[in-house]
Every structure is written in structure tokens, then in C-alpha cells.
Amino acid sequence: MPVFYRKDMMPMSQFSELLREYIKNKDITIKALAEKCGIDRTYLHKILKGERKVPSVDFVENISLQLMLSTEDKSRLMELYNISEMGEDVYNRRKQVSKIIHDMANTNMEEPDALTFKTEVDIDSVPEISIYTDKRELRKNLQVLICSDVHNGSDIQVIAQPTEFLTNLLSIAAEGSESTINHLFFFDNTSGEKNTAKYNLDIFPFICHLAQKHEKYEAFYYYEGASAYFNSTNIMPNIMITNNFLIRTDSDYCEGVIYRSKPMVEFYMRQFEKFKTKCAKLLDHAVDILEYVYFWYDDNANFIGVDFQPCTMLCLTEDIYNAHALLPADAKKFVKAKLTMGKKALSEHKFVNLFSEKGLAEFMTTGEIFELPRNSYTFPTLAERKIMLQIMISLCENGMADYRIIKDDYFAVSKNLCINISDNTSLNIVARNNCFSDFSYLKISETSLVQAFWDYFQHFIDSDAVCSHEETIEILRSYL
């Protein structure tokens, strides 16, 4: 039978009430359950009354097993336990970050299908003012007119909150073009809210998806109270400007006005540029491996990296690097200098690298290095790979780096995504296509996003999802 909860109930009370409901449904006495679990009956009574904290996740696992709970019921009980341990805001934020990572790992980096509709528009045939009160008509004309202008070399200026529709519209319009998209929006900094990162994390995937697809997508943000913004009487808050069109719509793209007017376009462009100067740049793109290496080793802070494979760049000897790097001489020298800086930083800052054992096995079997595009190096030999693995083990044993294996049962690490985060400084995201020939490099420095990801991985490292330092070293040794 379904169980319902009041929003004003404390997390432990919710846990206790749900557990009481499960016990009642299973028709088992408290005494019998306590004996099955090997715990004191009085202690279990106090937990069921919400007078005692649940001692550990093992307790929840054990009692779920003894009650023979379904996967869904156990998951709900575990969720309430985690909420009681972390607090609801922290739990929801970490859950949100986990979902963002999962979605980014499954983003399709391949080229989308070509547009199947006509994008050429006779500008003179478009009315000077077009008013739309039908959502389908408005959205169709937005796509046609913006795509037509971009096809003829126009950039796009946007003031609007990131949404799925806007991301799809701009992705379609920018596909295959060299046009720049300048996008202005706000991040929430509502005073007094416990979890101001929630709204920012809500819109971040839309921004990130577009940035990974289009190198010339430039995102700028300012701070605003989200509740004040959405409760305001601002009419037609969304603004889009191309060479020939000024577009204003409501927040949901259901109604709007499209102006074909050069004076209007020029006036709003001047206002847009003024507003842009008051905004901060959200992200930087790296267009090649050299810029990415600069991003990676430029942060002077503690560092967590998450990838399918272990980080092998810090394990390259000079001989191995010189033998396999397929770069021009000046680029080869630059990357080598940055790698030296990265190794030196290990003596001053903490570096944690999370990876999968499958990734380790694949590197030791093939020599492929997922951190680099395939056209930038040749694969190290088996003997060289063993030297690199020995260096990796040495870094772990000497406390220079903390390599940790993620257990596949808890977290599926993707080949298509690498995340590197510096302690409250920056978030670096690398997305790869399925052929590992095209990489997207992004660096984000907005505080609420960086702190949310840093907190998530700090918690994740200490969870049962990750092998201990000693367990990881033992597994690494098994591949020598």
C-alpha cells in the first residue's frame, strides 16, 4: 500500500514511520525482527519511535534483507536514511549533481542529422511586426527566422533563462555555422535560502549541453533572486537579436512579437552590449589539447579527477613522452612544461583520481590513453605501460597522489566524460565523441556550481562506492 508523508515531518520521523509501515505490512513482531537482525529489541523500539538515530547504512541493509523488501521499498528506506544523515537540502543537491553527471556522460557528441526544413527566407516578405499568440506558430517561426539569419552569417544575442526549448533552438540554429551565440541569464543568489545552488544546478545542464555542441557559445551571468524574478510582472522577458530581427517572448515561448526593423535591432544591440558589461563570463572553451592542458595545470589548488581510466599523464617519463607524442616541436615543449608543473604541484596539493578498474584493464591491454585525442600520440608498448603503472603505484605509496577505483556496482564511469575539479576554484569538463577524435573542453568558475560538485565528490570519495587507498594499490599491483 502507498505511504504518504507530511512535508513538515523530520527526516528521522519519516524513516521511522516508513519502517513501521513496512513491518506492519510484513506481519512480523518487533521482537521477532530484532532477533532476526541481531539487535536489542528496546533499541529497535526507540528507532521506530524516532528517539534514536539509525546507527549505519549496514543497519538499513540488514533490516531490508530481514524484511525481504523489494528493491523499490529498500531504495526509499535508504533515501530517508541518507536524508536523515545529510539533511534534506544537502542530500537533494548531491542527488542533483549525480544526475547531471549521468546525463552529461550520456550526451550524444555525434553530429545531429541535417535540418529537413527550408531555412532560406525572403526578408522583405516578413512583416515589420508579427504578433504570435499560438505557441506552435511562434516556435516554428523562431526556428525558421533565426536559422535563416544565422545561415546568412548572423550572430545571435540572447537574454533569457536557459531551458530545454531554448537549448534545442540555439543548437539547431548554430549547427554547422561559425556564428557566435552571446547568452545572458541570471544565477540565483536568493538571500536567506538554504539551498541557493538548486536553481543554478537546474539550468546548468542546458548551458553545458549547448557549450559542448558549439564552441562559439558564450555564456554570461549575473545574480538575481529567482523567486523575485519569476514572481515579477516583467512582460516578455526573453529577448533574441539577429542581424534582421528583434524577438521578444514570454518566459515559456508561448506568445511573442517579432520585429523586422533595423532601428529596433540596432537600439536593442546597444542595450544588450551595455548589459553584457555588467555580467560575468561563465565558461571558457579550449579548442585543442594545448589549451586544455593549460586549463588543467593552471589551477593552484587541491584537485579531484574522475575518468574511465586512471590519470596516466602524470606517469609519463620523458623518454615515453618523446617517443609517442605526435605534436609539433613547440607544442611538444609546451605540454612537457605543463606536465612538469603538474608533477611539481603534487608535492604541494592533494590530488585524488577516481577511475574504473575496466579503464585500468583497457589501458594495460591496449595502451590507449583516453585523456588525449587519438591523433596526438601513438600507444605506449606493454613494457612502457608497466613502467607507467609502477610510477602510479609509487605516487600512491609516497602520498603524492591518491588513485582510487570506483566500484562499478555503485557508479557507472563513462568513456565519454572526464571531470576535473579544483577545490572551490574551477570545474573542468571534457566530453568525448565515440571515436575519441573530437573533444569538448569546458572550464567553469561560478562559485555555487563549483562548490556543489566539490562537495559531491568529497562525499563520494568517502562512500562505499570507492575502494580504499590500500585496496586500490593492491588492484594496481595485480596488473604488473
Where do the language-model regions lie?
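A short, Lys/Arg-rich alpha-helix, primarily the initiator
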Residues: 2-29, 36
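Short alpha-helical "recognition helix" segments of helix-turn-helix
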Residues: 32-34, 63
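Recognition helix of helix-turn-helix/homeodomain-like DNA-binding domains
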Residues: 38-55, 62, 78-82
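Short amphipathic recognition helices of helix-turn-helix/homeodomain-type DNA-binding modules
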Residues: 57-61, 65-115
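The feature captures two recurrent sequence modes
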Residues: 101-132, 136
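Hydrophobic protein-protein interaction segments
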Residues: 126-478
